[in-house]
């Protein structure tokens, strides 16, 4: 009912996992899945590939659609990352495709098999659910004063303000 009345959702980091469509516990309001494999690593044991260690800085770049919605910030810039989701299309029928608003341009790696799985993937995506809007943000732009306007613009977009 909330989305059918035009409600908006903004999920940052864990909120993007929650919006996804690939978990039994997720809301399924965004047509994305998250990279959540667990593998056995020799001499280390079974490890979750989403875990990349403590908070770190990565590089991110807005797409043309991202600059239109989040603000006209050109080029690559730094953002805090702390194990946010690696998002890709889920392909759920009846759920519209998402638009990529920002792309990761670097990555954090804790285990060898993680190399290459974050860089050049969507960092921020936007979609619609019912008559509402969904914004999923993997990193933490809200933790940097220089990026407050990006978050504020995203909230305004989701709320149709």
Go through the PLM ranges and name each one.
Residues 1-74:
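A glycine-rich, often tryptophan-bearing local segment used as a flexible ligand/cofactor-contacting loop or short
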Residues 1, 21, 26-28, 33-36, ...:
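Extracellular ligand-binding/catalytic regions of CAZymes and related secreted enzymes
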Residues 6-11, 15, 84, 130-132, ...:
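Glycine-centered flexibility sites
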Residues 50-133, 138-142:
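Catalytic beta-strand/loop cores that center a nucleophilic Ser/Cys/Thr
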């Amino acid at each position: 009912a909330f989305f059918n009345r035009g409600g908006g959702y903004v999920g940052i980091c864990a909120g993007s996992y929650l919006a996804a469509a690939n978990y039994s516990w997720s809301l399924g309001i965004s047509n994305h899945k998250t990279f959540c494999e667990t593998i056995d690593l020799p001499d280390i044991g079974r490890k979750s590939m989403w875990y990349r260690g403590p908070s770190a800085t990565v590089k991110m770049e807005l797409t043309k659609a991202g600059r239109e919605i989040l603000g006209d910030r050109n080029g690559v810039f730094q953002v805090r990352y702390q194990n946010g989701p690696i998002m890709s299309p889920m392909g759920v029928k009846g759920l519209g495709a998402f638009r990529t608003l920002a792309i990761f341009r670097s990555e954090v790696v804790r285990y060898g098999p993680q190399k290459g799985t974050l860089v050049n993937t969507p960092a921020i995506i936007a979609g619609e659910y019912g008559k509402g809007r969904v914004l999923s943000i993997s990193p933490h732009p809200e933790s940097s004063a220089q990026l407050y306007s990006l978050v504020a613009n995203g909230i305004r977009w989701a709320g149709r303000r």
